[in-house]
Amino acid sequence: MTQQVKQALAAYDVVREKFGDAVSAFDSNETMPFFEVLDTDQWPDIALFMRDHPKLKFNYMACLSGVDYPQEEKLGIVCNLESVAALGHRVAVKVRCSRDGGSIPSVACVWHTANWHEREAYDMFGMLFSGHPDLRRILCPEDWEGFPLRKDYKVQETYHGIKVPY
């Protein structure tokens, strides 16, 4: 077990002790060790706990990526969190919601970097973030049809009378 995995597992244990079954089992089989938040409503509380707890200090959200799970009819996010200046460890946290009208609570008030990342996940996947301060498109025009990174996305033929070349 690498030092990175040991540190991530220790961080997971602190979160699991506080939140119990709201989080899944720890997994280190991917590039970055991760766990999943199973109780989506607790995501902001878990995020705040991870940022502020003295043994965790995850003070930096390096990335928040949207994911489409069409076979499960779910959308999700993967947040790469780091304790930059304090402890030097990192972990990924996954959160999923229903593909059809589900939402994930925003953590833009916990990590300011989440603001634009959540907007991008909304723009590309149609993922809703409840409580987001400014949830609107960030890359596509406001009147763009659909969400380009969903696996079932069909490119519109024209946009304002201009042929879309794909």
Curated annotation (Swiss-Prot):
NDH-1 is composed of 14 different subunits. Subunits NuoB, C, D, E, F, and G constitute the peripheral sector of the complex. This is NADH-quinone oxidoreductase subunit C. It is an enzyme of class 7 (translocase). Its EC number is 7.1.1.-. Belongs to the complex I 30 kDa subunit family. The keyword Chloroplast does not apply. PANTHER family: NADH DEHYDROGENASE [UBIQUINONE] IRON-SULFUR PROTEIN 3, MITOCHONDRIAL, NADH DEHYDROGENASE UBIQUINONE IRON-SULFUR PROTEIN 3. NDH-1 shuttles electrons from NADH, via FMN and iron-sulfur (Fe-S) centers, to quinones in the respiratory chain. The immediate electron acceptor for the enzyme in this species is believed to be a menaquinone. Couples the redox reaction to proton translocation (for every two electrons transferred, four hydrogen ions are translocated across the cytoplasmic membrane), and thus conserves the redox energy in a proton gradient. One of its GO terms (cellular component) is plasma membrane. PROSITE patterns: COMPLEX1_30K. Signal peptide: none annotated. Keywords: Cell inner membrane, Cell membrane, Membrane, NAD, Quinone, Translocase, Transport. It comes from Chlorobium phaeobacteroides (strain DSM 266 / SMG 266 / 2430). It is found in: Cell inner membrane. The keyword DNA damage does not apply.
